[in-house]
Design a protein with these regions (language model features):
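A structural signal for the hydrophobic beta-strands that form the central parallel beta-sheet
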Residues: 10-11, 56, 130
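Alpha-helical cap/lid subdomain in secreted, periplasmic
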Residues: 2-4, 33, 38-53, 62, ...
Length: 177
């Protein structure tokens, strides 16, 4: 999946951001203290001469719309060969009625699809990794919130299939942990 010379770009919200300090040179700060740094550390340990470039452009609080607003500068200009996206939790509107939330989830799926189509058009050889948004049993996790995120999880799963992307089922993995 990861090839020598690849440019890996991680996009998403606070989970991806993980307190990154983008102006730092050292990966321990530049990539944040989360999964992006762990992946980078492992790759560099296992393949130190592979020439793999790793970038983190996660922004805390990002929704899909905010991600899209910065897409040209924070994705297309970087020209990734492998693009990982984790977004969706900040697109949930827990506490709204089921019909409204279903409409919001449909709009989320369409906007996400448009973003992937735009990316593929600009970067025909890019490979996608689509990560499922997830909820942890922390804070107030209501049935409405679970339902809202489940709609977006289904959307990301469908998009991964449609765009021949790797799908990362975070919710199941975390539930099984």
């Amino acid at each position: 999946m990861i090839r020598d010379g690849d440019v890996l770009l991680f996009q998403g919200d606070s989970i991806t951001n993980a307190f990154r300090m983008p102006n730092e040179i050292n990966d321990a700060y530049r990539l944040g203290a989360g999964y992006v740094f762990l992946i980078a550390a492992r790759l560099r340990a296992l393949r130190p001469h592979a020439g793999i470039r790793i970038e983190n452009r996660g922004v805390s609080g990002d929704s899909l719309s905010r991600l899209r607003a910065r897409w040209h500068e924070d994705c297309l200009a970087i020209r990734p060969t492998l693009l990982s996206i984790l977004v969706g939790i900040n697109n949930t509107a827990a506490g709204v009625d089921l019909e409204a939330d279903a409409r919001d989830a449909e709009a989320f799926e369409q906007e996400y699809d448009d973003l992937l189509v735009l990316t593929r058009k600009s970067l025909p050889k890019v490979r996608f990794v689509l990560c499922e948004p997830f909820l942890l049993p922390a804070g107030e996790v209501t049935d409405d919130r679970i339902r809202a995120i489940a709609l977006r999880q289904g959307a990301v799963r469908r998009l991964a299939a449609r765009h021949h992307a790797v799908f990362v089922p975070f919710q199941r993995v975390l539930a099984d942990a």
